[in-house]
Structures are given as structure tokens and as C-alpha cells.
Amino acid sequence: QYSNELDLALLKIQKTHAINRLPFLELSNLRKISIGDPVLAIGHPEQGGFWTLTTGTISSLIENFQSIPGKDVFQTETSINRGNSGGPLIDTYGDIVGINSMIARKGKNNVAITDINFSIKSTVAVKWMNSVGHPFHYATPKVTYKNETDSIVDNAGIVPVPKQDKIPI
């Protein structure tokens, strides 16, 4: 099934003996996403032949994008191209927060612009799946033994550096 307005499609995977071993990511219910949050986009550029991982942040939260009711999107400067359009926009917890879908190349009066990309919010995809007869239920949050939410940033060993005051020259 396909939604032309939302640019979403639902694909059926044929059952095989390996179906239970397919890796997957969870869809986020977006309880904690906000402007400035880091995100990742995964893709496969058409001409490059390599898988790519690009990083960026949530720049803006937009409701009813292009005047289409329910088409809520994130604006992100995460690099989106034809190779990762349709792929996941992932938060630091490894959950899908959006589906990469649109790239703005030109502004008013044909002025060239870069790094203005849009991803449909995962909650929009879930509402659409439910509306076409494929009910979806969110998974429970992943919790570690410390009772803290498990984060990709934590698992990667990335240590945040505190902001420091600038030293006058």
C-alpha cells in the first residue's frame, strides 16, 4: 500500500526460514525528541556503491507540511540524498524517529540552498499504518541495569564535553 500525499509505502516481506533473524529498529513514539537533538541517516547512494551514515540535528518541528493535514515532519540538516531517502532517521537511542523523504534544493526565486531536508515523523507513519489496517504498537523503552535508558551515545563511549567560557584575547 502507498500514500502519495505522505510519501509512505508499506511493503510485505515474504515469510522464509530466516524471517525471524532479520534485524530491525524500533519506531519511536517521539516523547523526548526536540530541536537540537542529534540524529543519524542511513543510506546507500546510487552511484557510490557504499553504505553511508550521516549525522545532524533536528532543526525544526513542522506540522501539516505543504498544507497537508497530518503530514508532520522534522527539518534536519542531516544529509539526505536519493540513496537514503525512504530510509530511517535515527535518534541516539537507535530508534527510528522519522523517514527521510524530502530535499529542498532551491528557495524562492530559484536561489540555491543546501542542508534543508525533511523527514516524516515516525508517529505519522504509525497513524497511517493503523489507518490502512496494519495496527502498530510501540515497544517498551530499553532499560539498562542502572535503570537508565540505553543510548547509542553511551554504548559508543562518547563522553560529552562541558561547555566552557570563552577566554578573551
Predicted regions and their residues:
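Catalytic nucleophile loop of clan PA
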Residues: 79-100
